[in-house]
Design a protein with these regions (language model features):
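Acidic/glycine-rich phosphate/pyrophosphate-binding loops and surrounding catalytic core
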Residues: 79-129
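Absolute protein N-terminus
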Residues: 1-2, 129
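Compact, glycine-rich, soluble single-domain proteins
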Residues: 2-96
Length: 129
């Protein structure tokens, strides 16, 4: 099946794959070639792609997926392949987010910092696998 992962910034991935394990708001689902048509909401988490019998990871946050005619299209708010993650930058982003969460901030500022922290922790998990 063909897997397309697209964010507002760029096409992250377009290739033929054997299996995709996707975090959804209802739990993880495995999608294989010729899967029934499907539309669902993606959760923040680790997306696992199997190609050539070997798995690799992508950090993904929010969005939707559509499976139709043996093509899986994922429109994500954020997605990055493990090999593209710059660990030092992500660790710095994590420290900044933790600092902002400890400071007296508005609820909106806290939620933004919390979302950044979750994204940083996810990227570190995927990058250090």
């Amino acid at each position: 099946m063909i897997l397309n992962i697209i964010t507002p910034e760029k096409v992250v991935l377009k290739e033929e794959v054997e299996e995709v394990i996707v975090p959804t708001v209802n739990g993880e689902i495995a999608i294989l070639p010729n899967h029934v048509s499907l539309v669902t909401q993606i959760a923040t988490g680790e997306l696992i792609v199997k190609r050539g019998g070997k798995p690799y990871s992508i950090a993904i946050a929010g969005g939707f997926l559509e499976m139709q005619k043996n093509e899986l299209s994922i429109l994500a708010n954020f997605a990055i392949r493990a090999e593209d993650i710059e660990v030092a930058k992500v660790e710095e982003a994590q420290r900044r987010a933790e600092k902002l969460m400890k400071e007296k901030t508005t609820d909106d500022d806290f939620r933004v910092a919390q979302a950044e922290l979750i994204k940083a922790v996810l990227q570190l998990k995927v990058a250090t696998k």
